[in-house]
């Protein structure tokens, strides 16, 4: 659906060049929720604005739905943008318009007949759970409700692609979860491709199928969420499990710290007790959790193994064969 090839964006300010994006290559499959994860200043917002050409790249190609959009004429670009919806951190609603009027606005601009506009807006308000708020004004809504209006407005023209620019970062955790659940429902029901930028790990865990990590304007890693967190040494896995570091310091001097990762049915298997019985090692569980990530049940354990070195190595080979993806964490 989206293909970025050698995307580079350089800003010139006070006689200096600031490289916001450097040789970014990215593939977003059709029908996925694809996350761009990075801290402030990583280039996330610049990247998403290059996708719809609100920012024109300095170099590289931007392919959306089979078209290289940097080569389109102004008229062709306007038509292409109608197939891309966008939602924002600060909602960007018209205070003087009702909820109905905000959602109807892009359809009015596009010249839709009034009867068709009413039908479409009512359909979308039902989809986002605001059918009873059609006559309300933005100042009468909560933050989560405002974002739902923004989502409905972005969906109004029937886009193939939805761009989300930190759409949940201004919301509290409970509201964030409900908005992300709505995006997942829209993705499944409409088959809509969603490109979502965020600095929040929980957003990636809850809703993304795939992710790219952006650091200092460069993609340092990309792939399926489950694939990356199951890969020892991956950057995403490291970021997901930074919380294990405090527990990792509570270790026996002769112990070996191992991070284990389980997906699906394997998360319910008693692999640790089986490993202890078979390989004459002791296991001290320092930390553990079971979560829903990318639609799958995911378990992780930080375990301290003690015993003879050869027995521990045999145990680790066994765990790898069982799909537990063991990663030894160095001491110190």
Curated annotation (Swiss-Prot):
Reaction catalysed by this enzyme: L-methionine(out) + ATP + H2O = L-methionine(in) + ADP + phosphate + H(+); D-methionine(out) + ATP + H2O = D-methionine(in) + ADP + phosphate + H(+)
GO cellular component: plasma membrane
A single GO molecular function term of this UniProt record: ABC-type D-methionine transporter activity
Record's bilayer topology term: Peripheral membrane protein
Keyword Transport: yes
One Pfam family linked to the record: NIL
E.C. number: 7.4.2.11
SMART domains: AAA, NIL
Residue stretches spanning the membrane: none
Protein localization: Cell membrane
InterPro entries given in the database record: AAA+_ATPase (IPR003593), ABC_transporter-like_ATP-bd (IPR003439), ABC_transporter-like_CS (IPR017871), ACT-like_dom_sf (IPR045865), MetN_ABC (IPR041701), MetN_ABC_transporter-like (IPR050086), NIL_domain (IPR018449), P-loop_NTPase (IPR027417)
PROSITE patterns reported for this sequence: ABC_TRANSPORTER_1, ABC_TRANSPORTER_2, METN
Principal cellular location given in the protein's record: membrane
Keyword entries, A-Z: Amino-acid transport, ATP-binding, Cell membrane, Membrane, Nucleotide-binding, Translocase, Transport
CDD domains assigned: ABC_MetN_methionine_transporter
Binding residues for ATP: 38-45
Top-rank EC class of the record's enzyme: translocase
Domain ABC transporter: 2-241
Entry's family note: Belongs to the ABC transporter superfamily. Methionine importer (TC 3.A.1.24) family.
Summary of the function given for this chain in its UniProt record: Part of the ABC transporter complex MetNIQ involved in methionine import. Responsible for energy coupling to the transport system.
Subunit note: The complex is composed of two ATP-binding proteins (MetN), two transmembrane proteins (MetI) and a solute-binding protein (MetQ).
UniProt protein name: Methionine import ATP-binding protein MetN
Natural source organism: Symbiobacterium thermophilum (strain DSM 24528 / JCM 14929 / IAM 14863 / T)
